[in-house]
Amino acid sequence: RKRLPRAWATTFSTVFRGLPELLTLLIIYYGCQIAAQKVLAALGYEGEFLINTFVAAMIAFSLVFAAFSSEIWLAAFKTLPKGQWEACSALGLSKRTGFFKVLLPQLTRIALPGLSNNWLSLLKDTSLVSTISLVDLMRQTNLAVSVTKEPMFFYGVACLGYLLFAALSGRVFAYIERRSNRHLQGARA
């Protein structure tokens, strides 16, 4: 009963964790356009079909982020004792209520450090979207460098931009982690 969904999830995770992000981006952007063009041509439509670069980047990075995050959530699930489900059942909670009110808050607390690392990787991977002509920080930096011939200045500014985003993200995740662990502070003392 669970074999098919498990096989699909394992295949999805293996494929998108195994492919380089740039290759995934190029396959989604160019491959989907070519596939859609062929399907539409078979249906008699001879016009051009273009995928928006932002949409292609969003889909590609969502697939990669989902694949890596699925492993983090799986590990979080494996750390929860089986007694948690039993306790929810003993309290008369439905599976849905038990999951959302009891288990998910614990899972989120466990998964947050890994998810924050994934977020930082995703943040850095956004520099790859310049390869499909989506205007981003790196594309603007490369344009400025080609016009002014001052690579160190503009790449330094890009560095500061990415470091600023990473630092702000780190602060947000640190706050969320502190907030999700606040009930444990008294137990540690």
Enumerate the predicted regions with their spans.
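Transmembrane alpha-helices and adjacent helix-loop boundaries
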Residues: R1-A189
